[in-house]
C-alpha cells in the first residue's frame, strides 16, 4: 500500500506522573492537530468532499481532553487510534490538549484524508473522484511553500472491502486492483465509471 499519509505531530513526550504507571501532560492543541487550523481556513466549498483524520500510531492514549480554561471536553479515541472529535478553529488557536497514557509513553500522530462518502456496497464513482481531487488541492494548500513535497493523492482505498469492481456507464464491469491486499479505485484509470461495487460494504474509505 503506498504511503501518502503524513506523520505530522512528531513525538509527544509525556511528563508529570499522576498515578502508578500513568502520566499526563498538557500540550498546545496545534501540536497534536497540526495543519487542522489551516484546513479550517480553506473555504467550505473547497473541502466539502473530504475530511481529515488524526490517528495515534503505535501508542494510543488512554484518555484525551480538550482543555479551555477550567473546562475539559473529552475527545474520544477509537480502537484504531483515530480521534473521533476534532477541535474547531477557535479551540485549535487557544486550547490545550491533555494527554493521558502509559508511563513514559511517546506518541506520533498521522494525518489521513477520508472521503465524505459513507462506506456502502455501492458508491458513486464521481463522488469518490471529487474527494480525491479536493484532497489533492488541499494538500498543496496546507503544505504552503513545501507544496512540492505534499502527498499526491490518486485514489481511494477500501479496507475490508471484498470483491470490488467498477461498473461503467455502459454497463461494463471491471475488477478493482488490489494494493497490498486492499481494493483500490484510481479515478484516472477508470474514465466513464458510474459506481464502485462490493459484495459487502468496506469498513472504511481512505484517500491515498
What is the predicted role of each segment?
Residues 3-8:
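N-terminal export leaders
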Residues 15-20:
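N-terminal signal peptide c-region/cleavage motif recognized by signal peptidases
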Residues 101-118, 201-206:
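Short acidic/polar inter-strand loop motif in beta-rich domains
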Residues 139-208:
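Glycine-rich, aromatic-bearing surface loops/beta-hairpins
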Amino acid at each position: 500500500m503506498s504511503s501518502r499519509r503524513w506523520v505530522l505531530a512528531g513525538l509527544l513526550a509525556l511528563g508529570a506522573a499522576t498515578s502508578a504507571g500513568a502520566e499526563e501532560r498538557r500540550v498546545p492543541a496545534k501540536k497534536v492537530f497540526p495543519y487542522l487550523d489551516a484546513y479550517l481556513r480553506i473555504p467550505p466549498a473547497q473541502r466539502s468532499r473530504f475530511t481529515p483524520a488524526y490517528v495515534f500510531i503505535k501508542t494510543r492514549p488512554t484518555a484525551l481532553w480538550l482543555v479551555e480554561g477550567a473546562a475539559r471536553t473529552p475527545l474520544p479515541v477509537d480502537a484504531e487510534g483515530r480521534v473521533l472529535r476534532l477541535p474547531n478553529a477557535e479551540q485549535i488557536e487557544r486550547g490545550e490538549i491533555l494527554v493521558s497514557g502509559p508511563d513514559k509513553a511517546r506518541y506520533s500522530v498521522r494525518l489521513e484524508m477520508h472521503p465524505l462518502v459513507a462506506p456502502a456496497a455501492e458508491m458513486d464513482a464521481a463522488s469518490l473522484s471529487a474527494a480525491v481531487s479536493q484532497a489533492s488541492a488541499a494538500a498543496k494548500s496546507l503544505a504552503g511553500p513545501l507544496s512540492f513535497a505534499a502527498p499526491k493523492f490518486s485514489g481511494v482505498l477500501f479496507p475490508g472491502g471484498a470483491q470490488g469492481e467498477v461498473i461503467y456507464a455502459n454497463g461494463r464491469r471491471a475488477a478493482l486492483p488490489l494494493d497490498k491486499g486492499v481494493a483500490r479505485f484510481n479515478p484516472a484509470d477508470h474514465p466513464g465509471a458510474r459506481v464502485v461495487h462490493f459484495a459487502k460494504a468496506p469498513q472504511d474509505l481512505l484517500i491515498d
